[in-house]
Amino acid sequence: MAKKKATFICQECGYQSPKYLGRCPNCSAWSSFVEEVEVKEVKNARVSLAGEKSRPVKLKDVDNISYHRTQTDMSEFNRVLGGGVVPGSLILIGGDPGIGKSTLLLQVSTQLANKGTVLYASGEESAEQIKLRSERLGDIDNEFYLYAETNMQAIRTEIENIKPDFLIIDSIQTIMSPDITGVQGSVSQVREVTAELMQLAKTNNIATFIVGHVTKEGTLAGPRMLEHMVDTVLYFEGERHHTFRILRAVKNRFGSTNEIGIFEMQSGGLVEVLNPSQVFLEERLDGATGSAVVVTMEGSRPILAEVQSLVTPTVFGNARRTTTGLDFNRVSLIMAVLEKRCGLLLQNQDAYLKSAGGVKLDEPAIDLAVAVAIASSYKEKPTSPQEAFLGEIGLTGEIRRVTRIEQRINEAAKLGFTKVYAPKNALQGIDISQGIEVVGVTTVGQVLKAVFS
C-alpha cells in the first residue's frame, strides 16, 4: 500500500500549501485551493493479482496476441474504439445526465459477458435496479456479475476474487477510497480511485470502463488529470428530446479520435444507425427555403447532413445570431463574407442556424452549405433537393479545397443526389460515380449566382 500525504494545491498556478488558504500567495487567485494527495510509492507496491511484478521487456519480444481486440455485437461501438476493446485499456465515458451512458455500458456488458467475465460495479443503483433495466436488453450470460458498492477497497477485493476480463465502474464520482480524506467526487478521491483502477487494469489486462459525470459546461467533472490518465475518452452526446445519440472519441490511444458511432434510443435499448445520412435527411422538406445539404466527414465516414437557416428582419437595435450544432464564430465569419463579397445586407437581419437531427458540424467543409442556406432564407428562394455543397470559404470569398473530396461526392451519389458544388481546384484526377454532376466553383458569389439565378 502506498503512503499518502495530504496537501493543498492551487488549481491556477500549482502553488502547494500544507493547509487550506483562501487566497493563493503566488498568483492571488481566490478559492483556488483543493486538497490533493501526494503518493509515495513503497517497495513492491504495484504488482498484478497473481503477485507478479512488472519487469522491463524488449519491444520486439512483446506478445501482440495478448492485445487482441474483443469485438462487441455493435459495429458502431467497435468503430469508435478503433476496432474493438483492447485488454488492459482504461476507457472513460462522459455525457449529460439521462443521455444513456449506463444503458450503453449495460448493453455492451451483456455482449462482452459472452466472451469473458464481466464485473459491473455500480455506486448509483442497486443490483435489483440494474437487473430491472437489463431485462429489456435480452438474455444475460452467467459470467455477468453485479456489485453495488462505493468502497474502492471492497471493489478491489471482489476483483481479486472474480478476476474479471472486463470491469465497469458506474460512476467514478460515487466511488471513494477510505485511505483518502474528502467526500465522494472530490478532486483527491477521483484522482486516487482512477489511479488505482489504472494500476489494476494495466497489471492484470482488465479492460475497464469508467462512467464520468459532466459539468454544466459539458466537460468531464473532476480534475483534468483524469482525462490524461485514461487511454480513451468518449463523449455520449445527443439532444434529450431526440432519440438519436452520438458516441464520439476525443482521445484514443488505440485508434482514431475522429470516429463517431450513431445510435437510436428505443424501448429495447440502443440500436445502431447503420445509414445515418438517410436518417438525417428523411424529414427534409422539398421546396423549403433556408436549407442546404453538406457531406461532412466524421472520421473515415462521410455523412450527409442538413444545414437550416432562418433569416428575418430584426425588430431590435442589434441583430441577433443564434446557432445550434454549428460554431458561432464560423457562422459570423460566413455572414460577414456574404455581406462584403456578395452584397447581402445582413446587418439588420436576425439569423438562426442549426444542423438538423442534433449532429454537430464543425469542419471547414460545411462553410459553403452554411452560406447557401443563409442566402436561401434571405432571398426566399429554395435550393434543389438533389444538390449538395462542399467547400471552405476564405475571407476574400474564395472556395478552398477540402479533404476526401472523392469519397464525399460518391456518398452523395449513393443517396440519389444529382449535383454537387465543390472547389474547382480539388477536382483534378478524382474518380466520380456515374449519374452525378460535379460543378467546380471558385467563389461563393459564383455559387449563389448558379443556385438562385
Swiss-Prot record:
UniProt motif RadA KNRFG motif: location: 251-255
Entry keyword annotation includes Phosphoprotein: no
UniProt region (Lon-protease-like), positions on chain: 350-453
Keywords: ATP-binding, DNA damage, DNA repair, DNA-binding, Hydrolase, Metal-binding, Nucleotide-binding, Stress response, Zinc, Zinc-finger
GO cellular component: cytosol
Record carries keyword Nucleotide-binding: yes
First-tier enzyme category under EC: hydrolase
Chain positions of all zinc fingers (C4-type): 10-27
Top-level taxonomic group: Bacteria
Listed Pfam families: AAA_25, ChlI, Zn_ribbon_LapB
SMART domains per UniProt: AAA
Protein task: DNA-dependent ATPase involved in processing of recombination intermediates, plays a role in repairing DNA breaks. Stimulates the branch migration of RecA-mediated strand transfer reactions, allowing the 3' invading strand to extend heteroduplex DNA faster. Binds ssDNA in the presence of ADP but not other nucleotides, has ATPase activity that is stimulated by ssDNA and various branched DNA structures, but inhibited by SSB. Does not have RecA's homology-searching function.
Matching HAMAP family: RadA_bact
NCBIfam families in UniProt: sms (TIGR00416)
Comment on protein domains: Has a putative N-terminal zinc-finger, a middle region with homology to RecA with ATPase motifs including the RadA KNRFG motif, while the C-terminus is homologous to Lon protease.
Name of this chain's protein: DNA repair protein RadA
Lineage: Bacteria, Bacillati, Bacillota, Bacilli, Lactobacillales
Gene: radA
